[in-house]
Regions:
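Active-site metal-coordination/substrate-binding segment of hydrolases
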Residues: 78-149
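Acidic-enriched catalytic cores of C-N bond-cleaving enzymes acting on peptides and small amides
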Residues: 184, 193, 214-244
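Acidic/histidine-rich catalytic neighborhood of metal-dependent amide-processing enzymes
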Residues: 118-194
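N-terminal helical capping/dimerization or prosegment-like subdomains
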Residues: 1-95
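Flexible glycine/proline-rich, aromatic-decorated loop/lid segments
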Residues: 190-206
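Short small-residue beta-strand/loop micro-motif enriched in glycine and branched aliphatics
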Residues: 112-114, 209-215
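Generic secondary-structure signature for well-ordered alpha-helical cores
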Residues: 12, 23, 49-50, 136-139, ...
Length: 244
């Protein structure tokens, strides 16, 4: 049996597993779902182990946990690839706008619909399935592989940097493949050359406290919102020419 045949023959099981994974409301932004994020991490541990990955473990950080596993038998002459993904998801509110409950996933037109089905539970599950298929049919992987999945990506990975620094040797690799992204079609991936971080801010503007009479004011009255936009466009560092 080839790995392609293996994937095809087990497709229905893989879909059921993704549905089971998406049912876990692992919303990292909400304290009430902390245990759910941990539960999702344990789900990943079990799934990696089932796939034949070794040294699999849930590792604590100062906030949400990470999951690590590896298969390092390709040989010292082969590169080591670290595969990254995340098992936490965004909040699903407002729930009333969903056609079906976000944590009760359904399959419609061959598409799994539920919170996190794409970002990133479906994405991170694919390399696990690929490794399982290769190990089941060929008994080996073409390269050494490390898996590193986190549970805090959707909140900006606030405690991931110190964890990585403390575990630099464990996570050392020749290249990193992110399973948190997209590709153009089944056979054509895309390459992302940069990612933006998160910015949170609060802007307070003030203007007239009530309606103004043109006869009393004798001219135009500045509206702070369009004025701010105009000033922004005049800024050569972030002006209109840089925004289309």
């Amino acid at each position: 049996m080839t790995w392609q045949t293996y994937l095809k023959d087990h497709q229905s099981r893989f879909v059921d597993e993704l549905l089971d994974f998406v049912r876990i409301p692992s919303v990292s932004a909400k304290d009430e779902h902390f245990d759910d994020v941990v539960r999702a991490g344990h789900w990943v541990v079990e799934r990696l182990t089932q796939a034949g990955i070794e040294n699999v473990r849930l590792m604590e950080t100062e906030t949400h946990p990470v999951v690590y596993g590896d298969w390092l038998h390709a040989g010292s002459d082969k590169p080591t690839v670290l595969i990254y993904g995340h098992f936490d998801v965004q909040p699903a509110e407002p729930f009333e706008l969903w056609e079906s409950p976000p944590f009760e996933p359904v399959v419609i037109d061959d598409t799994v619909r539920g919170r996190g089905a794409s970002d990133d539970k479906g994405g991170m599950l694919i390399p696990i399935l690929a490794a399982e298929a290769l190990l089941a049919t060929e008994g080996k992987l073409p390269v050494n592989v490390k898996f590193f999945f986190e549970g805090q990506e959707e909140i900006g990975s606030p405690t991931l940097a110190p964890f990585i620094a403390e575990n630099a040797k464990l996570l050392q690799a020749d290249m990193i493949f992110s399973a948190d992204g997209g590709q153009w079609d089944e056979n054509q991936p895309n390459m992302i050359i940069g990612l933006k971080g998160l910015v949170g801010c609060e802007i307070t503007v003030s203007g007239a406290k009530g309606d103004q009479h043109s006869g009393m004011q004798g001219g135009g009255i500045a509206n702070p919102i369009p004025c701010a936009f105009t000033y922004h466009c005049l800024d050569e560092r972030a002006g209109w020419e840089n925004h289309g």
